[in-house]
Regions:
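Short, charged, surface-exposed hinge/linker loops at domain edges
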Residues: 1-8, 28, 35-75
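Short aromatic-glycine-(Arg/Gly/Cys) micro-motifs in beta-strand/loop hairpins
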Residues: 6, 10-24
């Protein structure tokens, strides 16, 4: 059965970057835009999976989601 890994892009308001949370051990990504984040996942995640989860066979997939929390302007 094909494996799907979850990768969340969490927006850090202070640092102004998306940071990763993932079920892929060792995957650490930061990027200034969501598009850059996705490109880094596509580039780096297959290598990290191969290195840290050698029993996982291709093909595998990445479910990439973006999360951003906004404060109300009326606080």
């Amino acid at each position: 059965m094909d494996q799907t890994f979850k990768v969340a892009a969490i927006w850090d308001t202070e640092a102004k970057v998306f940071s990763s949370q993932s079920d892929i051990p060792g995957l650490v990504i930061e990027a200034g835009t969501f598009e850059e984040f996705v490109a880094l996942v596509e580039d780096l995640a297959p290598e990290v999976v191969a290195a840290n989860l050698p029993k996982v066979k291709r093909p595998f997939y990445f479910d990439i989601q973006s999360h951003r929390i906004h404060a109300s302007a009326h606080i």
